[in-house]
């Protein structure tokens, strides 16, 4: 066996088997196996559980009427907004206070958290939503449970309309989150949690009659699991996630790009341009067309070949007269 083949075999022995897979997984999930990380995951689970229990509980219709009154819509909107503001204030310093899979996906797309971390976050959020909705179902009398706050598109609207509405209201929510939590800003003096809560409340005031105003895939997922109602459920994942990614990308890369990121991108583009250009720098050459037809470039020296006379006329060194700089 040759030395190259032997080296390849040794590498395969180390990285081709089960041990390499284990090491690769450990590297991919670096930072996950810490106490702080699991505290953050638990915080997302608990925050979502409480949020769904309190906010979805406000949608329970105790009066027996088919449609909620305008005053009830205001109550629902305020309950959702104040609930999320409270949870962000309580758990924001532990987990970042995502409490929304769409927000977590936006954070991944803007390189604020890792993909591995987002997987655990979204799983915890969905489990919290299911348990929160389950507790609400258990403590609510059967005759008033109704749909348990399952989000549905209005009967006069198509799925496309619902998708667009969810995209828009989630866009404004996530843009508010990025703008309020921007560490580069020095003009933010109010409560970040309250700003996020107001954004959620505004989205509900506008969109309750359209789609139920989800803005949060986990919030829709929990009641849907408990009630087994999956009608147009995909809208409440696709719409919010697209809106969140658009908002995060626009804020981070267009409106308020990070200075360090801009510098790195500029350096990368400059380096790529230099590599594409090559080792020679073009300069103006005032010689006649006949004289420059056969120009051979060598590092530091220019040679002109006169075909008629078969002579090799050596040009001046680039240090003496600039013909081409290397």
Swiss-Prot record:
Residues 1-39, 93-96, 105-118, 180-187, 256-326 are cytoplasmic. Phosphorylation by PKC at Ser-183 reduces conductance by 50%. Phosphorylation by PKG at Ser-114 in response to glutamate increases conductance by 40%. Isoform Long: Palmitoylated on its N-terminal region. Residues 61-72, 140-158, 209-211, 226-234 are extracellular. It is found in: Cell membrane; Basolateral cell membrane; Endosome membrane; Cell membrane, Sarcolemma. Forms a water-specific channel. Plays an important role in brain water homeostasis and in glymphatic solute transport. Required for a normal rate of water exchange across the blood brain interface. Required for normal levels of cerebrospinal fluid influx into the brain cortex and parenchyma along paravascular spaces that surround penetrating arteries, and for normal drainage of interstitial fluid along paravenous drainage pathways. Thereby, it is required for normal clearance of solutes from the brain interstitial fluid, including soluble beta-amyloid peptides derived from APP. It is a multi-pass membrane protein. Residues 97-104, 212-225 dip into the membrane without crossing it. Disulfide bonds: none annotated. This is Aquaporin-4. The lineage of its organism: Eukaryota, Metazoa, Chordata, Craniata, Vertebrata. The gene is AQP4. Keywords: Cell membrane, Cell projection, Endosome, Glycoprotein, Lipoprotein, Membrane, Palmitate, Phosphoprotein, Repeat, Transmembrane, Transmembrane helix, Transport. A lipid is attached at residues 15, 20 (S-palmitoyl cysteine). The chain crosses the membrane at residues 40-60, 73-92, 119-139, 159-179, 188-208, 235-255. Aquaporins contain two tandem repeats each containing three membrane-spanning domains and a pore-forming loop with the signature motif Asn-Pro-Ala (NPA). A motif (NPA 1) lies at residues 100-102. The keyword Cell membrane applies. GO terms for cellular component: astrocyte end-foot; basolateral plasma membrane; endosome membrane; extracellular region; plasma membrane; sarcolemma. CDD domains: MIP (cd00333). The modification Phosphothreonine is found at residue 292. GO terms for biological process: cerebrospinal fluid circulation; intracellular water homeostasis; multicellular organismal-level water homeostasis; protein homotetramerization; water transport. It comes from the Eukaryota. GO terms for molecular function: water channel activity. It catalyses: H2O(in) = H2O(out).
């Amino acid at each position: 066996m040759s030395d190259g083949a032997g080296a390849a075999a040794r590498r395969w022995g180390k990285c081709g088997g089960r041990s390499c897979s284990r090491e690769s997984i450990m590297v991919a999930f670096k930072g996950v196996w810490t106490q702080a990380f699991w505290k953050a995951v638990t915080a997302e689970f608990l925050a979502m559980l409480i949020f769904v229990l309190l906010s979805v509980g406000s949608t329970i219709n105790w009066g027996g009427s088919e449609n909620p009154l305008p005053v009830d819509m205001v109550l629902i909107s305020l309950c959702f907004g104040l609930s999320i503001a409270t949870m962000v204030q309580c758990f924001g310093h532990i987990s970042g206070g995502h409490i929304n899979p769409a927000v977590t996906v936006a954070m991944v797309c803007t390189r604020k958290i890792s993909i591995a971390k987002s997987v655990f976050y979204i799983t915890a959020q969905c489990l919290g939503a299911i348990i929160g909705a389950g507790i609400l179902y258990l403590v609510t009398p059967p005759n008033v449970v109704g749909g348990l706050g399952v989000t549905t598109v209005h009967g006069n609207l198509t799925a496309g309309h619902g998708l667009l509405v969810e995209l828009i209201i989630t866009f404004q929510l996530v843009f508010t989150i990025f703008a309020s939590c921007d560490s580069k800003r020095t003009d933010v003096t109010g409560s970040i949690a309250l700003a996020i809560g107001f954004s959620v409340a505004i989205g509900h005031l506008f969109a309750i009659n359209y789609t139920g105003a989800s803005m949060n895939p986990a919030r829709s997922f929990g009641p849907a699991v408990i009630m087994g109602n999956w009608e147009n459920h995909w809208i409440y994942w696709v719409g919010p996630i697209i809106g969140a990614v658009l908002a995060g990308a626009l804020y981070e890369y267009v409106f308020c790009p990070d200075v360090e990121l801009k510098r790195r991108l500029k350096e990368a583009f400059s380096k790529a341009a230099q590599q594409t250009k090559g080792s020679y720098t073009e300069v103006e050459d005032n010689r006649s067309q006949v004289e420059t037809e056969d120009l051979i470039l060598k590092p530091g020296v220019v040679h002109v070949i006169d075909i008629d006379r078969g002579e090799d006329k050596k040009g001046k060194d680039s240090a003496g007269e600039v013909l081409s700089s290397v």
